[in-house]
């Protein structure tokens, strides 16, 4: 029997208003659906931002949280691929974690490494109904590069 999804790592950039809004939306949906989740946007470290110590602490925390998660839900903005999010998706896939790639819009080009390396491809609004128990695999139907 496969392990039930209970704890989710919510990957995605949060560098502008749209990304923050979408992250907040995903957090609300996951909370409403009863999942425990780790959202890097909500977690800080003690080191001074911009220092190597800060970088090392963020990296260690996020890597540990990916290990602790049952799955990764990644907010993806197509051609604009946040390097941190891409790393988190690749790392999660490499250690056998399901990766649910959540496309923030239907117009952007998508990177083949992210769409093919993910368990499934859904859109932001699909988070409300996606079946995390059976993890159906949906192929990406949009433009890709």
Go through each PLM region and give its residues:
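Conserved catalytic or regulatory cores that recognize and/or transform ribose-phosphate-containing ligands
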Residues: 1-145
């Amino acid at each position: 029997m496969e392990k039930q999804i209970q704890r989710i790592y919510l990957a995605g950039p949060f560098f502008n208003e749209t990304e923050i809004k979408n992250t907040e939306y995903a957090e609300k949906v996951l909370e409403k659906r009863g999942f425990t989740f780790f959202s890097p946007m909500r977690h800080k470290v003690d080191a001074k931002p911009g220092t190597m110590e800060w970088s090392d602490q963020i990296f260690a925390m996020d890597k540990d949280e990916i290990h602790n998660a049952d799955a990764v839900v990644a907010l993806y903005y197509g051609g604009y691929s946040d390097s941190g999010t891409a790393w988190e998706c690749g790392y999660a896939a490499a250690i056998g974690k399901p990766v649910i790639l959540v496309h923030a819009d239907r117009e952007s080009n998508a990177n083949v490494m992210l769409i093919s390396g993910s368990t499934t491809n859904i859109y932001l609004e699909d988070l409300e109904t996606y079946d995390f128990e059976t993890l159906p695999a949906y192929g990406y139907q949009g433009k890709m590069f």
